[in-house]
Amino acid sequence: MSSAEDGELDPQIQIELENLNSATDEINKLEIELEEANSTFRILLNESTRRLKVSSKKLGNCIEKARPYYEALDKAREAQIECQKAAVKFQRANEIHAAAKETVALAEQRFMSNSHEWQFDNAWQEMLNHATQKVMDAETQKADCHAEHQRLTKLFNAAEQKLQQLEDRFRRSINKSRPYFEEKQVCQDQLQTQKNRIQELQQQVAGAKSTYSTALRNLERISEDIHRQRGDFPTPPGPREPGVGAELNSPTSSALPSLPDFQLELEKCDYPSIAGSQMSLGAKTPQAAAETEDEEDACDYDETGAGELRGVVDERDLEALRQKVKILAVRPIEGGDGQQQNDVWEHELKATVDKLDHLMMLKETAKRQQTNRLKSTEQRPDSLGAEALKRHCDVVEVKVTSCATTASLPVTPHHQLNHLAPPTPIKKLQQQLAPLPSVNVSMRELPLLARLSNELLDRSSAAFGGVRKTLRRRSLE
């Protein structure tokens, strides 16, 4: 091998080596950005699901009541967009039809004005036939577009009517759950934007790897040509395997975990008690039924203290934080060659999300305190005298019942259990609402029972006569 042959190298080798090195750097940079974009997507998904679960737990059954309205709202928007597209198509078809008719009219007018000079030959006949065919096609297209526009208009009107009916029926639930669905829409937009960014990075990585494999194959081809010209080694039999990094199915792309379906994850947040719904209806206790009724009635309360809530948490601060989270979520990662400020960016995003959650928790706490104050005001008795009089009547009733039972009434196991264990508030309420128990008493014992009850009432009234007068005076005042 001479020195002249060593110096005569193909200049394409240097070009392919530069392409190979640049493709390697591009692959490394894009893979780092892709990994960070995936982690950002998962952070956003976790934070979005957590915020939506908190809001869903707070609103309760109002989300279920308002869901048909927002689904109908989406369908109405889609129908409106389709109707607008059909209107544009009909307008274009109408313009094409008018232009075709004008072309035929001008051709006929031009021929009639020069009929003494021109002859109606086959060329004129073919031109008029072609223009007439265009008019007929445009008229058919116009009729089809008009029918399609009418059909979509009817669908849009039906969707609007259904939307109005649902709004009139569930107005309170819709107004109360509006922040939840707006927050859900913001989360969906953020996650969709981040997912589009991930897909774009994946395509860029695939393109960079394709460039890398092309440069590597070119280098292999140049190497084979050089060895064939020199005749140093015989050509190995069989096809040559691809080099490192030139595989068609790259292990790097398959090693990355697939993105979860964020639509499904966000839909799960709408059902906070999905585990409890698996219980049978027959196993539902009265307390659970009462809690369900309270939850259904909770979405119909009147928000009279909206000014106090605005004093605790400003809505403008919440909106500013939401916009900041949205900007941080879709902000591209700056820098290259794997030198990104990942820690600073993640810390800023996490701090903003924590601050937003803190303000939302303050708002939720203020709402709960206001609701508790309203409930306590509704459950408060009219006057102190009425409460004391009711307590005194309960004491007299208990004494009369105990004495009468000791005197003549038979003691059943149910009555004996009630006397041994003090009644709970729920049982006490049931005893007040339930009818009196039926007792088998003979006609001979009725005068004795009447005399005993009259004596007990006289004693109790004599003992608490002064207290009754005072309480009565207070209640009247």
Curated annotation (Swiss-Prot):
Q: Which domain of life is it from?
A: Eukaryota
Q: Does the keyword Coiled coil apply?
A: yes
Specify the protein name.
SH3 domain-binding protein 5 homolog
Q: Which residues form a coiled coil?
A: 12-95, 122-221
Q: Where is this region: Disordered?
A: 224-258, 276-306
GO CC terms for this protein?
cytoplasm; cytoplasmic side of Golgi membrane; plasma membrane
Give a GO molecular function annotation for the protein. protein tyrosine kinase inhibitor activity
Instruction: Tell me which residues bear Phosphoserine.
Output: S113, S115
Q: Give the originating organism.
A: Drosophila melanogaster
Key words of the record = Coiled coil, Phosphoprotein, SH3-binding
Q: Which PANTHER family match?
A: SH3 DOMAIN-BINDING PROTEIN 5
The alphabetized list of GO BP terms reads: anterior/posterior pattern specification; female germline ring canal formation; intracellular signal transduction; mesoderm development; muscle cell fate specification; muscle organ development; muscle organ morphogenesis
Report any Pfam family annotated for this entry. Answer: SH3BP5
Q: List the disulfide bonds.
A: none
